[in-house]
Design a protein with these regions (language model features):
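Acidic, aromatic-lined catalytic clefts of primarily extracellular/periplasmic carbohydrate-active enzymes
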Residues: 1-91, 97-153
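Cell-envelope/ECM-targeting effectors and their regulatory/trafficking segments
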Residues: 110-113, 117, 131, 135-216
C-alpha cells in the first residue's frame, strides 16, 4: 500500500514552507507566482489571494504528486520517517531532482546512512549556501534517520542496545552498518579506545563518555 505523509511530516513541511495568502515571487526572475504553502504554477496570478482553508487544500493536493513520486522512485523498504523526509525534500527541490539524485541511488542500494548524508548537498541556491536550506536539510536528514540510526542517550552494551543505536555506533566507527553488534563492531570499539589511550575493554560496552567522543 502506498504511503502518505504523516501529521509530523506535514508539520515539518509547513514550518519551512510557511503560509502566505497573497501571491508573491521570491525572486523577480521566477516564472510563476507562489501562494499558500509553497504552491507555484500557472494557476497563481499576480494579486491573487486565498483563505487558509484554500491553502490547506492546495497543500493536500500538491502532496499527492510528491508522495506518488517518492513511492514510485524508492524501490526498497523505508520507514515512515524516511518517507516524510523524502516528501519534504521533493516538495522543496522537485520530484525530478530526487529521481536523478545520488541520494536515491544510495537509498535504493539500502545504504540508508549514506543516503541521509546526501541531504546536506542540497543547501544551495544559485551556487550559494542558504542558511534556511541548510537548516531544512539538517531537519530532513535527522527525520530520515530517526528510529533507524539513533545516537544512544545512555550507556549501551551488546545485550541492551537497540538496533538503531548499534547502527549509529557503526556509522561513527566507520564499519559496516547492519545493526548487529558483532566481532567487527567490537574490534572497532577496541581500536578506537586504544587510539584514545583509554583502558582496554571487551568492545561490547559503550559508555556515555565514549559516545560523546564518537559524536565530535
Amino acid at each position: 500500500m502506498a504511503r502518505t505523509t504523516s501529521t509530523a511530516g506535514i508539520a515539518l513541511l509547513k514550518k519551512f514552507e510557511g503560509c502566505r495568502l497573497k501571491a508573491y515571487k521570491a525572486l523577480p526572475t521566477e516564472k510563476y507566482y507562489t501562494i499558500g504553502y509553497g504552491h507555484s504554477g500557472a494557476d497563481v496570478k499576480s494579486g491573487m489571494t486565498i483563505t487558509l482553508a484554500q491553502a490547506e487544500a492546495m497543500l493536500k493536493n500538491d502532496l499527492k504528486n510528491f508522495e506518488k513520486s517518492v513511492n514510485n522512485y524508492v524501490l526498497v523498504g523505508m520507514t515512515q520517517n524516511m518517507f516524510d523526509a523524502l516528501v519534504s525534500f521533493s516538495y522543496n527541490c522537485g520530484g525530478t531532482v530526487l529521481k536523478g539524485s545520488t541520494l536515491l541511488k544510495k537509498l535504493n542500494k539500502k545504504n540508508y546512512v549514506d543516503a541521509a548524508e546526501q541531504f546536506m548537498k542540497w543547501n544551495k541556491s544559485g551556487g550559494k549556501v542558504i542558511p534556511g536550506l541548510t537548516e531544512r536539510r539538517a531537519k530532513e536528514r535527522a527525520l530520515f534517520l530517526r528510529g533507524y540510526c539513533d545516537k544512544p542517550t545512555v550507556q549501551v552494551s551488546k545485550t541492551t542496545a537497540k538496533a538503531s543505536y548499534v547502527r549509529w555506533l557503526q556509522w561513527k566507527l566507520g564499519v559496516k552498518i547492519d545493526g548487529v553488534w558483532g566481532d567487527k563492531t567490537a574490534a572497532a570499539i577496541r581500536a578506537k579506545r586504544k587510539k584514545l589511550g583509554w583502558p582496554k575493554t571487551s568492545g561490547y560496552i559503550c559508555t556515555i563518555k565514549f559516545i560523546k567522543v564518537l559524536d565530535k
